[in-house]
């Protein structure tokens, strides 16, 4: 969302992580408004005060939008790792996962550490490191990791997406 507010699915996935008390009804009303006005979900959040039926949730939605705007303003000055660390600090996501204490929460904490390591490595090796470039690289690796090695099919990709990958 910091990089691309037009990715409605991504915005909807993070709007309540960690929990912000924004209910499904509010999210659905914002989505309906976005669809009616032919705008992105994030753009609809930015004008939440004008959406009928949102009511008391406006303050929570405004807080979310303000956080994203603040992160966007820091983007040119922060490394990818610093930006991720700032998001974690501002949202208190790590704190929430630690208090959960479940196996899944511990796995997520380990994933966060791995993401931070990848961000640091990306900054060292990329010619012109950016959040967009990092997200593209991480998405590429995730796609390749999800491939089944023993599956009986051909995998096609662009030359751009194959850059930096190794094949047997």
PLM regions with names:
Residues 1-168:
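Conserved helicase C-terminal RecA-like lobe
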């Amino acid at each position: 969302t910091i990089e691309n507010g037009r990715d409605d699915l991504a915005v909807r996935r993070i709007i309540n992580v960690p929990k912000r008390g924004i209910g499904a009804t509010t999210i659905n009303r914002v989505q309906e408004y976005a669809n009616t006005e032919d705008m992105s979900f994030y753009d609809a959040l930015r004008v939440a005060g004008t959406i009928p039926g949102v009511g008391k949730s406006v303050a929570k939605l405004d807080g979310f939008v303000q956080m994203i705007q603040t992160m966007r303003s820091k983007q040119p000055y922060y490394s990818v790792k610093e930006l991720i660390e700032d998001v974690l600090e501002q949202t208190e996501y790590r704190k929430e996962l630690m208090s959960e204490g479940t196996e899944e929460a511990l796995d997520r904490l380990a994933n966060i550490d791995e993401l931070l390591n990848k961000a640091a490595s990306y900054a060292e090796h990329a010619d012109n490191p950016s959040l967009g470039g990092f997200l593209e690289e991480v998405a590429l690796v995730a796609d390749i990791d999800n491939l089944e090695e023993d599956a009986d099919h051909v995998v096609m990709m662009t030359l751009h997406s194959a850059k930096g990958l190794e094949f047997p």
